[in-house]
């Protein structure tokens, strides 16, 4: 029996500037957070270190990508601030 992969939508909070957040998608959450904290991701390197604020697991890749796209909109960011 093979295990079904998970797809993650995550929100990071900068520990150096708590007003900074980053929303992303990955299949390997631990490794992706490590990449952000190592400075391997140009968009987030300036505001290291990061802490994982929220992670949501999906079994459906497309649903995960839909949520990521939504959370990157103005109304999605407002939703995340209030609910996540």
Task: Label the predicted regions.
Residues 1-43, 48, 55, 62-77, ...:
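GIY-YIG nuclease catalytic motif and its immediate N-terminal context
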